[in-house]
Amino acid sequence: PAPEFKAVSDTVYVKTNGGSVRVRSSCDTSTSDNVVANVGNATELTRTGTSEKWDRVEYEGKTVYISSDFVTTEVPKEPETSAASSNAAADGHVTLNHSWKYADFAKIKSGAAVLYRSTASEKKNKVIAVNAGHGTKGGTSVKTQCHPDGTAKVTGGTTGAGATSAVAVSTGMTFSDGTAESKVTLAMAKVLKDKLLSAGYDVLMIRDGEDVQLDNIARSVIANNAADCHIALHWDSTTSNKGAFYMSVPDVASYKNMEPVKSHWQQHNALGASLVEGLKSAGVKIFSGGSMAMDLTQTSYSTVPSVDIELGDKASDHSQSTLNQLGDGLVAGVKAYFGQ
């Protein structure tokens, strides 16, 4: 049910840490279908109603809704930004908002993602969440619920089938040459960020350093609310240098009928297939048919197109030239998915 609004009439401003916040046509954060626009820090709005968690405002002649956490009656200061790469400035931290759908399931949530804005001449007006897998200190000492409805996992993986809880963030594997997976996923994320920024995409770096205190649920919920899609970067734990693939949504009726999977699984699989095609076009070796069915915490809580892409395994080369090749393939996949 829609919240009850107390009628008001005043001027308010959007207050963010420099990033943008979504305004919606309804008070529902479980879908991105109702997003009208992403509005930036200090945007002036006319407020017509207030409720406990939402404000009703006028934006470009439309009545829209914005989370009250991002509204202030005083003109906010512009945040200090630092040049993040030759193509963007760090535009602000995005933290987990407790009012966002599924946020309460997160256990490790004090960290922040970092939003980078493209300064390319042709902007795509899309935010890509790039999630460098693993890299949360203490992530294995905490467990989170596998599914929002409390049901058990339908496939194996880091956590076996039948489990209802899983480690909040696993440590990941170690490459055959002794390098930690979390180190390589971060290096890959930085390469991908720069290539996406150059191509006109804004990038939400879920993990922008060695450690981020955000578990897999927090990472997914932040991406749900601050990005147009969510790409988690991983390498598999096998040792055969088998190639890249994406984790597809298992073809299990009970799982596909559980929300939010039910409303979004086709988007997840379509994004994964596009990324694999992009990698293939860049000359990257692809494993089998390019996908492997897996019940993941990420997929179980995602309300935007979301995928875990495995870019190889323990035996794979992870030199800078290989990361560049992988980055080119992933960008091609993103462009294809969005038809850009």
Model-derived regions: residue spans:
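Short, flexible active-site loop motifs that bind/organize anionic cofactors or intermediates
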Residues: S32, G61, F175
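Short, compositionally biased
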Residues: E58-D69
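SH3/SH3-like beta-barrel fold
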Residues: A42, D55-Y59
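Acidic/polar N-terminal loop/beta-strand segments that form early-domain functional surfaces
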Residues: S26, E60, G133
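SH3/SH3-like (including bacterial SH3b) beta-barrel domains
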Residues: S25-T50
